[in-house]
Amino acid sequence: TEEAMLDKVCSEFSKVIVVINANNPMELDWVDNYDSIGAVILAPGTGQTGMAALGEIINGSVNPSGKTVDTYVKDLTQTPYYNNIGAFAYNNVDDLKEAIAASDTAYEGTVSFVDYVEGIYVGYKYYETASDDGVINYEDVVKYPFGYGLSYTTFEQKMNDFSDNGDNVTFNVTVTNTGDVAG
């Protein structure tokens, strides 16, 4: 299993980089179970040449600059999706049941549906809103938030030319790379 592989690799090496090659967010709290995991690289949908660049990121010759485009949680069983999904049965579709039974020998007699209720509170929008509303403790639920990502360099930000005329607020931000590598 993947867990057995991680156990073996992390018991043999003190510096481990985990590469997640998956297009969908997943539960990632397990990362904290291994002291030797020093980095997690998200490499979804790499296409024809993406994996070739991965080695350059791992060896430090290319600075990773991507950010997460969704939220990665600690426990999927606590997500709205997990708790709203199910096989709910219709009880007013007798004609449909008969038609299905006549054409499908594997039919077991239930016409089910999914009660999808997240609405606008899907993905990172749910976690940000639920945290602001006091429904969840963000740090207890979210492992890697929307927009998370590290770099091999450091930056300094400075706000300049702040102006508030009552109707509009304007300002400029100067971002300076203060590290030794491009970012």
Language-model segments: which ranges?
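Hydrophobic helix-and-loop "lid/oligomerization" segment in the mid-to-C-terminal part
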Residues: T1-D35
